[in-house]
């Protein structure tokens, strides 16, 4: 923390993006002390450092601050009601960040794209590529979000000098099962390898909200940014991968 404090005091950045998190929900349930330290205490320390240096914080949060029990998509002013420890600590961190009205909270959901850190899409593609079955929940919904579009929305927040809460998430509320089917179809894999399962059959420790889908219309109104639907978002990833391979062959 001292290194970070010295860096911020030296560079005096206009914006600090806080994306620190343990993203494994079951890990958070089993390691509550570590989770609270990273999500809440570290956020409080970073917020204090940034406020002293007049740096805006953009805090990356989650749809899991909601319980997922309502049928409509959640708006930014809906009251958080997390049902697992990950969501609980992220909701606490949001409150800390928003004590400064200049700061920003970006809630996102099930980020997908090209790379190792986007776990669900990587799991689906790696499995299908090897001819293995993919087991995906048919009763858990998310607003799956294209990674590149999420980054572009952050750029818009900085450009507009926005503040407050924004739901920076994809436009389609989709189950993991349907999402996996779309990935298989767009990438030309066998859709029959996608198998539907219920969260009730799973041995996960942390409770998952059933439908914490996010309404992203504020992004369009305030930031002038529109997220893609799931079909177009997955197609963008496919085109990105194609472009990477074309560049590889041109170089070698």
Locations of regions flagged by a protein language model:
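NAD(P)H-binding glycine-rich loop region in Rossmannoid oxidoreductase-like domains
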Residues: 1-38
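NAD(P)-dependent short-chain dehydrogenase/reductase
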Residues: 95-142, 147-156
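SDR active-site strand-loop-helix element
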Residues: 19-20, 57-62, 106-108
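Substrate-binding strand-loop-helix patch
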Residues: 114-116, 140-149, 168-186, 236
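NAD(P)-cofactor binding segment of oxidoreductase domains
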Residues: 30-58
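Conserved C-terminal active-site "lid" loop/helix of NAD(P)H-dependent oxidoreductases
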Residues: 175-181, 198-237, 241, 245
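Mid/C-terminal beta-alpha module of Rossmann-like enzyme folds, strongest
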Residues: 153, 160-204, 245-248
């Amino acid at each position: 923390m001292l290194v970070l404090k010295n860096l911020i005091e030296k560079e005096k950045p206009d914006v600090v993006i806080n994306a620190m998190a343990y993203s494994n929900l079951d890990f958070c349930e089993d390691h509550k002390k570590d989770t609270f330290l990273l999500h809440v205490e570290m956020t409080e320390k970073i917020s204090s450092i940034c406020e002293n240096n007049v740096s805006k914080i953009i805090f990356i949060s989650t749809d899991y601050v909601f319980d997922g029990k309502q049928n409509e998509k959640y708006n930014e002013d809906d009251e958080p009601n997390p049902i697992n420890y990950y969501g609980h600590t992220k909701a606490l961190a949001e409150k800390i960040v928003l004590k400064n009205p200049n700061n920003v909270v970006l809630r996102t959901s099930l980020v997908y794209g090209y790379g190792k850190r986007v776990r669900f899409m990587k799991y689906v593609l790696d499995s299908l590529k090897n001819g293995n079955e993919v087991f995906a929940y048919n009763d858990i919904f998310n607003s799956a979000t294209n990674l590149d579009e999420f980054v572009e929305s952050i750029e818009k927040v900085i450009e507009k000098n926005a503040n407050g809460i924004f739901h920076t998430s994809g436009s389609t509320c989709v189950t993991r099962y349907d999402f996996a089917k779309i990935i298989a179809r767009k990438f030309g894999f066998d859709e029959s390898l996608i198998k539907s399962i219920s969260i009730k059959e799973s041995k996960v420790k942390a409770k998952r909200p059933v439908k914490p889908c996010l309404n992203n219309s504020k992004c369009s109104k305030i930031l002038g940014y529109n997220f893609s639907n799931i079909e177009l978002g997955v197609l963008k990833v496919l085109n990105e991968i194609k472009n990477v391979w074309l560049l590889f062959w041109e170089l070698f």
